[in-house]
Amino acid sequence: MATTKLASGNLRQIAGELPRCRSVLAVCAHPDDESFGLGAVLARFEDLGSSVSVICLTHGEASTLGESAESDLAALRQAELADAAKALSLHTVRLLGYPDGTLGAEPQDRLTADVTQMAGETGADLLLVFDEGGITGHPDHMAATAAGLLAASRLGTPVLAWTLEQRVADAINSAFASTAFKGRVTGDLDVRVEVDRQRQMRAIACHKSQSFDNPVLRRRLAEQGTIEVLRWLLRR
């Protein structure tokens, strides 16, 4: 376990492994978030013996893929999510029908109730979410995280957030003018774990509509290497 000194002078312990859990529920906004973002972490939880499930709040129909009809893209991304779930060996996946792109405008009580229900059904003793800044600043990501936090606070369940090291975010933002990745300095991190990305890469390949030409994703994974970092948003 590594130790880092905070600005306050206190020492912060950075764990070198994920917490041991019976059941992990990942709360995502879009199909592909579970793979592009959380895939390696979910695979590591499974290696440690956790049952891993995902609740995805939208079908991702607002993507810029350019399908002829919005419903076609929604159906395609649903199928891609199902394939990715198999690649990641997920226990349960629930795909809801909230509108993509405006998740933050949905009644928060409804989102929270859906997450709470699935957390109860799966017996989740940990919720996994994107960091509060949504990683890319995407409002849907932030809304999904907020729903997960509210559900967890009602259930008394801890919440662990996937995030990026600040150097990774800075490198991507320097390389691509259109990006606004949010990173965290070392003093904000609680877990730094080495991962095997093989299952994640297989899951990413299932999302062909989103990964066919995605240089930003490739650059992020290259910058991360075999390391994932996380932080606690809510502890038991």
What are these regions (language model features)?
Residues 1-123, 150-154:
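Active-site rim/loop-helix segments in enzyme catalytic domains that contact anionic ligands
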